[in-house]
From Swiss-Prot:
S-adenosyl-L-methionine binds at Q275, F304, N309, E325, D352, D372. Its EC number is 2.1.1.190. Keywords: 4Fe-4S, Iron, Iron-sulfur, Metal-binding, Methyltransferase, rRNA processing, S-adenosyl-L-methionine, Transferase. HAMAP family: 23SrRNA_methyltr_RlmD (MF_01010). [4Fe-4S] cluster binds at C83, C89, C92, C169. Catalyzes the formation of 5-methyl-uridine at position 1939 (m5U1939) in 23S rRNA. The gene is rlmD. It is an enzyme of class 2 (transferase). Belongs to the class I-like SAM-binding methyltransferase superfamily. RNA M5U methyltransferase family. RlmD subfamily. This is 23S rRNA (uracil(1939)-C(5))-methyltransferase RlmD.
Length: 447
């Protein structure tokens, strides 16, 4: 009888394999990086220098992934995670390392990935931008599940849709963390508990805000219960159904958030993007002003400007600043806010920044550019951006791999990486943000 090769059984055999590893670094996603038989293996939950027995969970031609079965040696700085939910909650990945060690490892990962993908080394490393280690997050989404007569509020488990029930969160701003248990107690007895999709919690200048994602219309007794809760706790309660409304069914007025030093506050609505770490965001804005050094008479572009986080702060620094955003509603909100504040030197324009260069007059004679793209970076922007020949390009990156790829394009167009700095926006997580300043000059062009 013929015997046929089974790729599936071979793969299963390899995935059951147990091996011993000692990683040498963390990558930019917070995974330990080790080598086994010439192949790179990524292992969450380990620190460089620790030894562990692991099991492969994915085995590709060029790399593998593994899970820890047992640590056989610990890093001298390893600590017990302070949060009791850490082992199950997917929100944090690095609580077993002190924040100082986390930052050192993140900076090493940032340097490695930028150098690898762009061929660039910064002329100057900036000091990391830091904020509080705990209670820094001013926005979060709580998942809701009604199961066996019980309402569960919590965060998703790592790599899963399952919820981990929590009663507090040490990285969430205290006014928001303190609402978790009372919200569970408020909603659980109500019939609407079965119809809540999630809760969005945010801390605005106006105070705490809770948005209830409701999958059916709100009933009068439920409205009264939510209103009483909001009034007693100083919380603005909103409903997200087919539209975002207050409890009376009216449209919601824009909220605001502080960007420090008496600067004009951007306006936003729940659902808009804004930086979740207020202290570090203010530090980023101050560093942007310091690095760009906008001068009277200059013209600047703020690409991917959102509601004007940087644009409003830069108001008055240059003769003309143009914020460019691809979400029409946010453009309209930013325009209205600038008009409300009387900031005539600011303009906000809509443009699809993932495609060809906009054919617009405002692209001419640009002196400096700030861009703050999403994790995918700005591949559609880099070629035409470099052709504008601004004297300073400040790239705010939430993904170092995108920064490295986009930085390579700038390098090929004759820009050098003059400054690079870590931005520790999310302590205890694998998220790694950075700021990079590119200026014209001699540079080793990547091949």
């Amino acid at each position: 009888m013929a015997q046929f090769y089974s790729a599936k059984s071979n793969k299963t055999k390899h995935l059951s394999q147990k091996i011993s590893l000692t990683p040498t670094a963390l990558d930019h996603q917070g995974q330990a990086v080790a080598e086994h038989q010439g192949k790179v293996v990524f292992v969450p939950g380990l620190l460089p220098g620790e030894s562990a027995q692991v099991q492969l969970v994915e085995n590709k031609a060029r790399f593998a992934r593994a899970k820890v079965l047992k640590r056989t040696s610990d890093h001298p700085q390893r600590i017990a995670p302070p949060c009791p939910h850490f082992a199950r909650c997917g929100g944090c990945q690095l609580q077993f390392a002190p924040t100082g060690l986390q930052r050192d490892l993140k900076q090493q990962a940032l340097a490695q990935v930028v150098s690898k993908l762009s061929g660039l080394t910064p002329e100057q490393w900036a000091e990391p931008l830091l904020g509080p280690d705990w209670h820094y997050r001013r926005r979060a989404r709580l998942g809701c599940r009604y199961d066996a007569g019980e309402l569960v509020l919590g965060f998703r488990q790592e790599g899963s849709n399952r919820l981990t029930a929590i009663d507090h969160c040490p990285v969430l701003a205290e006014p928001l963390s303190e609402l978790i248990t009372p919200l569970q107690q408020l909603l659980a007895p109500l019939k609407l508990a079965r119809h809540v999709g999630h809760l969005d919690l945010m801390l605005a200048s106006e105070g705490p805000v809770v948005v209830v994602r409701l999958l059916r219309p709100l009933r009068e007794e439920e409205r009264e219960a939510l209103a009483a809760f909001g009034q007693s706790r100083g919380v603005q309660m909103l409903i997200q159904g087919d539209a975002l409304t207050d409890l009376s069914g009216q449209a919601v007025a824009p909220l605001h958030y502080d960007i420090g030093e008496g600067r004009p506050q951007p306006a936003f609505l729940p659902g808009d993007f804004f930086q979740v770490n207020g202290v570090v965001n203010q530090a980023m804005i101050s560093q942007a002003i310091e690095w760009l050094q906008p001068q009277p008479g200059e013209k600047g572009l703020d690409l991917f400007c959102g509601g004007g986080n940087f644009t409003l702060a830069l108001a008055g620094q240059s003769a003309e600043i143009i914020g460019v955003e691809g979400v029409p509603a946010m453009v309209e909100r930013a325009r209205a806010r600038a008009a409300e504040l009387g900031l005539e030197q600011l303009r906000f324009e809509y443009a699809d920044l993932n495609g060809e260069a906009p054919k617009a007059q405002w692209l001419k004679d640009v002196d400096w550019v700030l861009l703050d793209p999403a994790r995918a970076g700005a591949p559609g922007v880099m070629e035409w951006l470099a052709k504008l020949r601004p004297s300073r390009i400040l790239y705010v990156a939430c993904n170092p791999a995108s920064l490295g790829r986009d930085g390579k394009v700038l390098a090929q167009q004759g820009y050098r990486l003059s400054r690079l700095g870590l931005v520790d926006m999310f302590p205890h997580t694998h998220h790694l943000e950075s700021m990079a300043l590119f200026e014209p000059g001699n540079n080793k062009h990547p091949k």
